[in-house]
A protein has these predicted regions:
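Walker A/P-loop
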Residues: 29-50
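Conserved pre-motif I regulatory segment
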Residues: 1-36
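Post-DEXD/H (motif II) to motif III coupling segment of the RecA-like Helicase ATP-binding lobe
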Residues: 146-211
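Conserved helix-turn-beta segment of the N-terminal RecA-like "Helicase ATP-binding" lobe
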Residues: 66-93, 187-190
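Conserved Walker A/P-loop ATP-binding site and its immediately adjacent core
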Residues: 44-49, 53-77, 106, 151, ...
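SF2 helicase catalytic motif II
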Residues: 105-108, 113-169
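Conserved RecA-like P-loop NTPase helicase motor core
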Residues: 109, 314-318, 324-483
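Conserved C-terminal RecA-like helicase domain
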Residues: 38-41, 45, 69, 84-101, ...
Length: 485
């Protein structure tokens, strides 16, 4: 496929992007190009240019529908030549492939197994025949390690059937900390890593903002410490804590106090310029009824308990800090920004507002969509960027939908995730540059519960706690200055 007068990059290549592109002929000798590019490096843009240079008829596979749409949008905005009909060369449907067809791994699996998915019915559909007829000779895999087991099988089956196909593999988060078997499976699919674009060089080039990681330590609460001491007295010969207790301490209520203090500090420093994101593991929907009830106990790590803790703090300090909740099953905004939300939504959909807990509807409200709600997350994200919300609370699953907001300048990781892949995804949301604030810097806060009783009781150091080891795993593959070396 000759892309002359069809696709041409309209921008200027960064130094690190040009370095990769200058070596394409060397990388492609084994039929596979495998690029590791930190979040914010223009990974999608590189992928499109590689397809253009290889002059391939390409099938691009991505993790989610959101990312699929981002690929198509990027091609149109940054590559498509003036006067070219996009529909003639771009497709999001396996049933109607074009020069570049972008689809999800889920759709691939549905087509390979000939079942009906949410968008299309693949019963009786011969994907391999369609791809052969379309002369697909380039397979571009975006973050292919984000796959369920059955998706892996479908991808491997497709790859076996496609002959003389060049593979382009793009990722920000290689599964470095996976099992040897998983790593070997990944490398067999993508090939050995050809080039890595690192975070420090992206900061140097101005593609990512300067940022600092902080570790905020806390001790367990008195109640948690008493629970541990009871366990130790009942098991005097035990050399380590029960895994359930370790898990309990990883979700220590002391971390709630840490989050409160960090939030107060950041808001005192930035006020209306604060764009803080707090990511946790659970929503804790059962605590919705506690919101607005001062007598209710909300000491639990989760989206809604954290929201209520911070709401009470803001109320007690007469602070005008505005909070928001952004999750798939619940969205909360300040009541005073309802009109701004409606204006942002426009004709994209219909919105309703309802009471949150026992709060008066003049403070905070829940937001729901009438019918399809796909437009709500982008709309609330826009409110966040526009400063109507200073602190946004959500779960890590939000990232799986390809969510992003370059305005974030403070991130609290209130999650027990220790894997490099997910940690890098979360951390990457805070270090992007933002056009509205060219001098943006960002803080990333990691929470760790220590055990002050450990050294005297078990003869080991406090940092041997599972929570501390999780932090070590999380940090292991991040590049930065070492404290001593």
């Amino acid at each position: 496929m000759n892309y002359e007068n069809i696709l041409q990059f309209k921008g200027t290549w960064r130094v690190y992007q040009a370095r990769v592109l200058d070596r394409v002929e060397h990388y492609v000798r084994d039929g596979k190009i495998h690029i590791v590019a930190a979040p914010g490096s223009g990974k999608t843009t590189l992928g499109i240019e590689l397809i253009r240079r290889l002059q391939g008829t390409a099938l691009v596979l991505v993790p989610t529908i959101t990312i699929r749409e981002q690929w198509i949008a990027r091609i149109k905005e940054a590559f498509l030549c003036d006067g070219v009909n996009a529909e003639a060369y771009l497709s999001q449907s396996l049933k109607n492939p074009r020069a570049i067809t972008v689809t999800t791994y889920q759709a691939l699996h549905s087509a390979m197994t000939q079942i009906q998915d949410g968008e299309e019915d693949y019963q009786g559909f011969s994907l391999f025949q369609v791809l052969q007829d379309a002369k697909v000779d380039t397979l571009c895999l975006d973050e292919c390690h984000h796959l369920r087991s059955e998706w892996w099988k479908s991808l491997e089956s497709l790859k076996e059937k496609l002959i003389d196909v060049t593979t382009i593999a793009l990722t920000a988060t290689p599964p470095y900390d996976s099992t040897p078997a998983m790593w070997n499976r990944y490398i067999a699919m993508c090939g050995e890593i050809d080039e890595e674009i690192t975070t420090p060089e992206l900061v140097k080039e101005g593609s990512l903002c300067p940022h600092q990681d902080y570790v905020y330590f806390n001790y367990p609460t008195k109640q948690e410490e008493a629970e541990v001491m009871r366990y130790m007295q009942a098991h005097p010969d035990c050399e380590e804590l029960d895994p359930e207790i370790e898990k309990h301490l990883a979700n220590s209520l002391g971390k709630i106090e840490s989050i409160r203090q960090i939030t107060q500090h950041e808001y005192a420093s930035l006020h209306g310029r604060l764009h803080m994101l707090i990511l946790t593991d659970y929503i804790r929907k059962e605590h919705e009824k506690s919101i607005g009830n001062r007598e209710a106990d909300v000491n639990l790590l989760g989206v809604l308990p954290l929201f209520e803790n911070l709401r009470r703090d803001a109320q007690d300090m007469w602070s005008d800090m505005r909070l928001g909740v952004l999750c798939g099953s619940i969205i909360v905004i300040p009541a005073g920004v309802k009109d701004a939300l409606l204006k942002t939504v426009g004709d994209a959909g219909m919105v309703t507002f309802s009471k949150l807990g026992s709060l008066p509807e003049t403070e905070y409200v829940k937001v729901s969509a009438v019918g399809d709600s796909h437009f709500l997350i982008p709309a609330v994200t826009q409110l966040f960027a526009d400063g109507y919300i200073q602190v946004l609370i959500g779960t890590k699953s939000l990232l799986g939908e390809g969510w992003d907001s370059p305005c974030i300048n403070s991130l609290i990781l209130a999650s027990t995730v220790g894997s490099f892949m997910l940690s890098n995804q979360m951390r990457g949301r805070a270090i992007r540059t933002w056009d509205r604030e060219p001098d943006k810097t960002s803080n990333i806060w990691h929470l760790v519960c220590l055990k002050p009783w450990y050294e005297s009781s078990f003869g080991t150091k406090p940092e041997t706690s599972e929570d501390y080891r999780m932090l070590t795993r999380r940090m292991e593959h991040f590049l930065g200055l070492h404290y001593t070396d």
